[in-house]
C-alpha cells in the first residue's frame, strides 16, 4: 500500500519506531519512571569511550581562548548587534543563567554539563535570546574544538566579560564535561510557562524547586506574580537564593554586581516575539524568539518585559548601582512592553542609550533591585557596599565564583592555571593524603581485626552504606571520603541510627588507633578508609557464608575531614527524606515522592543503573542493612548471608501479597494455600515484582544459576557507590 500523502498524514512517522502516537506513559501516567537511570548513555556520546575531557582541557591554551573572547566582546555583529558596542552584559547573563539553575536540595541544575544548549532550558522564557549568545560563541568553540566544552566555555566567557569591563574575578576552573542529551529534571508541576502552582499555604515554595515560576531562573523581576512590591519581592529573593546555597551578603553582591552591567530588553509588544528555539521553524536553525517588532534586534530587541539600564557606565565596573539605588527616590513606571519597572524621580538623563550616543535616559531599576534597599537586612548590607566599594568587589568576585563553580564538587576536579589557591568552606574540603597508605598485607590484617571486633555484618554494611551513599552525582557532594559520618550533622541523622552508629565508630576508631600507633614508618589508615573496609570485610564474609568466594575491591586514600572543614548548615540538605536501600522513610519530614520514586531518585543521584539499583536492594535486604533492623523486605531465612533469596522469594507465586491492616504502605506476604504469614514488605520491596522492567532485572537474579552472578554484580555496584567520590581514582584511570 502506498503511504498517504494528504495533509492528515503529513509529518507522521511511517515506521513503528517513530515518536508519534501514544507512549507507554501516556497510557499509564502513574507508572514508575526509571528512564532517568539510563540517561546520557555512551550510545548518545559522539566523543567515544576513549575520550578524556580532562586530558584534552590540559592541552588548551587558555590565554589564547581568553584573547579571542576579549576580541569578541566588542566585535558587534549585524545579525545581533551589541548593546553599547559591548557584548559583556549578554555574556554575563548567559553564564549566570547557565549556573543559576543549581538548587541545593538535590544538587541538580547548574553549569556543570552545558545543559543550557538543550530543552527545556534553551527555551525557558528567562533564557530568551541567550541562543544568540551561544551562536556568537560558536566560532570560538569551533576553533578550539574538543579542548574546551560548551559547559566550560559559557562560564569562562562570563568571566572574560567581567574582566573586559574592568572587574577582577576570583578565578576560573575548567573540568565541566559536556553531556549530549537533555536532562529530565522536575522543574515544577506547571503546564504553562510562568505558572506558579508550586506554592501552597502562605507562599510555601515546594521542594526541591528553587525558582518562583516555571521558566524563571530565580524570581519575577516585576515582583511576586507581577506585584511591584520590593519588600514582598525580597522574601522571594531570600528563599530562592538560599535554595541555591547563597546567603544574604552573597545575594546582594550577585544582584548588584550583575546589574552593574548591561540592560534588560523590552522595546515593544512581547506578543510580536516568535516561538522559542524548541518550537521554531526548521529554517531558523535552532534560533528562537524572532521578533516582528521593528528590526527585531538592537534598539528594537525584546527579551522580556522590562526596559532597564541600571548604571551610567553599563560596560564598566563601578559602584553606580548602589549610588543610584540610594541616591534617588523611585516611582513606578511601565516599559514600552508594558512591564512594571521603576524610574528615578526627578532625575537627569545620565544613562547612555545602547545604540544612539546622542541620547540619554534616566536611571531605571527593577522591583527586585529596590528590594536591596527596602528589605531591612539587604539594606544594611547594601549601604555597607555603597560605603565600601572594595568590600562589594570582593564579595561579588567570591559569590560569582561560587555561583559558577558550586556544582563542580571538590577542588581536585578543578583544572587550569586560574584555579584559586584559597580553600573555601563550600567546597567541602578534605585534607590531602600526607602519610604512607596501607598495603595489601595491612588490609587483610585490618579486615580480620574488624571481623573479630564483635561488630555484625549488618552493622558494618549499614555504616559503610551510610557513609558513602550521601554522594550526589549532581553536584559531586557527599560520599565516604572525609568520614563526615562521624561529624555533625550526619552523626545525628535519624536514618543513621545515632546511638548504634556511635558504638560502631567507637570500635572502628579503636582499631584505627591501635594500628596507627603500632606503625613506625608513618603509615596510617584513616577512619574513612576503615569504614569502607569494614563494609568490604562484611560482604566477603557474608558471601563466603553463602558458599560464594569473592574479593571486594578496596583502594585506600580517603582522608578524614575536620569539623572546621564542614559547614553544618550546608550538609543538612544531604540528609535523606527516604532511603529505599535501607527501607527508610523520615515520617517527620514532608515527602514529595512515593517511596519507590524516592528510591529511583536516590539511585539516579548515586549514578546507578536499573540493574545496579536492583542488585543493591536485593543484597542489602539479606545483609540486614535495613533502618532500625526492620524485617520488612528481608525475604530470607538466612540473614547476613549474601544470597539471592530476596529475588527468589519475592517472585515466588506461592506467596500472595496484600496490604497490611492498619499499616500505611506495609504489605504482607502470605502462603497462598494456608494463609500463613511468611514475609512483610514495603512499596520499595514490592516494586521489584510489580514494575515490569524492574521485575525483568529481578528475574535475572532469581534464577537457579544466578547466585555467582548476583554476588559479582552486587560487589561491582557496591564498589561503585563506595568509590563514587574518589575522583583521584577516576583521574588516574582516565590518564592511564
From Swiss-Prot:
Gene Ontology terms for molecular function: catalase activity; heme binding; metal ion binding
Basic and acidic residues: bias regions: 1-10
Database matches in Pfam families: peroxidase (PF00141)
Superkingdom per UniProt: Bacteria
Record-listed heme b binding positions: 259
Needed co-factor(s): heme b
Cross-link Tryptophyl-tyrosyl-methioninium (Tyr-Met) (with W-96) per UniProt, renumbered positions: 218-244
EC number: 1.11.1.21
GO CC annotations, alphabetized: cytosol
Keyword Oxidoreductase: yes
Record keyword Heme present: yes
Region (Disordered), start-end ranges: 1-26
Entry's Gene Ontology BP terms: cellular response to hydrogen peroxide; hydrogen peroxide catabolic process
SUPFAM superfamilies: Heme-dependent peroxidases
Active-site residues, as the UniProt record annotates them: 97 (proton acceptor)
Cofactor binding remark: Binds 1 heme b (iron(II)-protoporphyrin IX) group per dimer.
UniProt modification remark: Formation of the three residue Trp-Tyr-Met cross-link is important for the catalase, but not the peroxidase activity of the enzyme.
Family designation: Belongs to the peroxidase family. Peroxidase/catalase subfamily.
Purpose: Bifunctional enzyme with both catalase and broad-spectrum peroxidase activity.
Assembly: Homodimer or homotetramer.
Protein name: Catalase-peroxidase
Species this protein is from: Rhodopseudomonas palustris (strain TIE-1)
Lineage: Bacteria, Pseudomonadati, Pseudomonadota, Alphaproteobacteria, Hyphomicrobiales
Gene name of the encoded protein: katG
Amino acid at each position: 500500500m502506498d503511504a498517504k500523502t494528504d495533509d492528515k498524514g503529513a509529518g507522521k512517522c511511517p515506521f513503528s519506531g517513530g515518536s508519534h502516537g501514544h507512549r507507554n506513559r501516556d497510557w499509564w501516567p502513574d507508572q514508575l519512571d526509571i528512564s532517568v537511570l539510563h540517561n546520557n548513555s555512551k550510545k548518545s556520546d559522539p566523543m567515544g569511550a576513549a575520550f578524556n575531557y580532562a586530558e584534552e582541557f590540559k592541552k588548551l591554551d587558555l590565554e589564547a581562548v581568553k584573547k579571542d573572547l576579549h576580541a569578541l566582546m566588542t566585535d558587534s555583529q549585524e545579525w545581533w548587534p551589541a548593546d553599547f558596542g559591548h557584548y559583556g552584559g549578554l555574556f554575563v547573563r548567559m553564564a549566570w543563567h547557565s549556573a543559576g539553575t543549581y538548587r541545593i536540595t538535590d544538587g541538580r541544575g547548574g553549569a556543570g554539563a552545558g545543559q543550557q544548549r538543550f530543552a527545556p532550558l534553551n527555551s525557558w522564557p528567562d533564557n530568551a535570546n541567550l541562543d544568540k549568545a551561544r551562536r556568537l560563541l560558536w566560532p570560538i568553540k569551533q576553533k578550539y574544538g574538543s579542548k574546551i566544552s560548551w559547559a566550560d566555555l559559557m562560564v569562562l566567557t562570563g568571566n572574560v566579560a567581567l574582566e573586559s569591563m574592568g572587574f577582577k574575578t576570583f578565578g576560573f576552573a575548567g573540568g565541566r564535561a559536556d553531556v549530549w542529551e537533555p536532562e529530565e529534571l522536575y522543574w515544577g508541576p506547571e503546564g504553562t510557562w510562568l505558572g506558579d502552582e508550586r506554592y501552597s499555604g502562605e507562599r510555601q515554595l515546594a521542594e526541591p524547586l528553587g525558582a518562583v515560576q516555571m521558566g524563571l531562573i530565580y524570581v519575577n523581576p516585576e515582583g511576586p506574580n507581577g506585584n511591584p512590591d520590593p519588600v514582598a519581592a525580597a522574601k522571594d529573593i531570600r528563599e530562592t537564593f538560599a535554595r541555591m546555597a547563597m546567603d544574604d551578603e552573597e545575594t546582594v553582591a550577585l544582584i548588584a554586581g550583575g546589574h552593574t552591567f548591561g540592560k534588560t530588553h523590552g522595546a515593544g509588544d512581547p506578543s510580536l516575539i516568535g516561538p522559542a528555539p524548541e518550537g521554531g521553524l526548521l529554517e531558523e536553525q535552532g534560533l528562537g524568539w524572532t521578533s516582528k517588532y521593528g528590526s527585531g534586534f538592537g534598539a528594537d530587541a525584546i527579551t522580556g518585559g522590562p526596559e532597564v539600564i541600571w548604571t551610567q557606565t553599563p560596560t564598566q565596573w563601578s559602584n553606580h548601582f548602589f549610588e543610584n539605588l540610594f541616591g534617588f527616590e523611585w516611582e513606578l513606571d511601565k516599559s514600552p512592553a508594558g512591564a512594571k519597572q521603576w524610574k528615578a524621580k526627578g532625575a537627569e538623563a545620565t544613562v547612555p542609550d545602547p545604540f544612539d550616543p546622542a541620547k540619554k535616559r534616566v536611571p531605571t531599576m527593577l522591583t527586585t533591585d529596590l528590594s536591596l534597599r527596602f528589605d531591612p537586612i539587604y539594606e544594611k548590607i547594601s549601604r555597607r557596599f555603597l560605603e565600601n566599594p572594595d568590600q562589594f568587589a570582593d564579595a561579588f568576585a567570591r559569590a560569582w565564583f561560587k555561583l559558577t563553580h558550586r556544582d563542580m564538587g571538590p577542588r581536585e576536579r578543578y583544572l587550569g592555571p586560574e584555579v584559586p589557591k584559597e580553600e573555601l568552606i563550600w567546597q567541602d574540603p578534605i585534607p590531602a593524603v600526607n602519610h604512607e597508605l596501607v598495603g595489601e598485607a595491612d588490609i587483610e590484617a585490618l579486615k580480620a581485626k574488624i571481623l573479630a571486633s564483635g561488630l555484625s555484618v549488618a552493622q558494618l554494611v549499614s555504616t559503610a552504606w551510610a557513609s558513602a551513599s550521601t554522594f550526589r552525582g549532581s553536584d559531586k557532594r557527599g560520599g565516604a571520603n572525609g568520614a563526615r559520618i562521624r561529624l555533625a550533622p550526619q552523626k545525628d541523622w535519624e536514618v543513621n541510627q545515632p546511638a548504634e552508629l556511635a558504638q560502631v565508630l567507637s570500635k572502628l576508631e579503636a582499631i584505627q588507633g591501635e594500628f596507627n600507633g603500632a606503625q613506625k614508618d608513618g603509615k596510617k589508615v584513616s577512619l574513612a578508609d576503615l569504614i569502607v573496609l569494614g563494609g568490604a570485610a562484611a560482604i566477603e564474609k557474608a558471601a563466603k557464608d553463602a558458599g560464594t568466594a569473592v574479593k571486594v575491591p578496596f583502594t585506600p586514600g580517603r582522608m578524614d575531614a575536620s569539623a572546621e572543614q564542614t559547614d553544618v548548615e550546608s550538609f543538612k540538605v544531604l540528609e535523606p527524606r527516604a532511603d529505599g536501600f535501607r527501607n527508610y522513610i523520615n515520617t517527620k519530614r514532608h515527602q514529595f515522592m512515593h517511596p519507590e520514586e524516592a528510591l529511583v531518585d536516590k539511585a539516579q543521584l548515586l549514578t546507578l543503573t536499573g540493574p545496579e539499583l536492583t542488585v543493591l536492594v536485593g543484597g542489602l535486604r539479606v545483609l540486614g542493612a535495613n533502618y532500625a533492623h526492620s524485617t520488612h523486605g528481608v525475604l530470607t531465612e538466612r540473614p547476613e548471608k549474601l544470597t539471592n533469596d530476596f529475588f527468589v522469594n519475592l517472585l515466588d507465586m506461592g506467596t500472595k501479597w496484600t496490604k497490611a491492616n492498619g499499616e500505611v504502605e506495609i504489605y504482607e506476604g502470605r502462603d497462598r494455600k494456608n494463609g500463613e504469614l511468611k514475609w512483610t514488605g514495603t512499596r520499595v520491596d514490592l516494586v521489584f515484582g510489580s514494575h515490569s522492567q524492574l521485575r525483568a532485572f529481578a528475574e535475572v537474579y532469581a534464577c537457579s544459576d544466578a547466585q555467582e552472578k548476583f554476588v559479582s554484580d552486587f560487589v561491582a555496584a557496591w564498589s561503585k557507590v563506595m568509590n563514587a567520590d574518589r575522583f583521584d581514582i577516576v583521574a588516574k584511570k582516565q590518564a592511564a
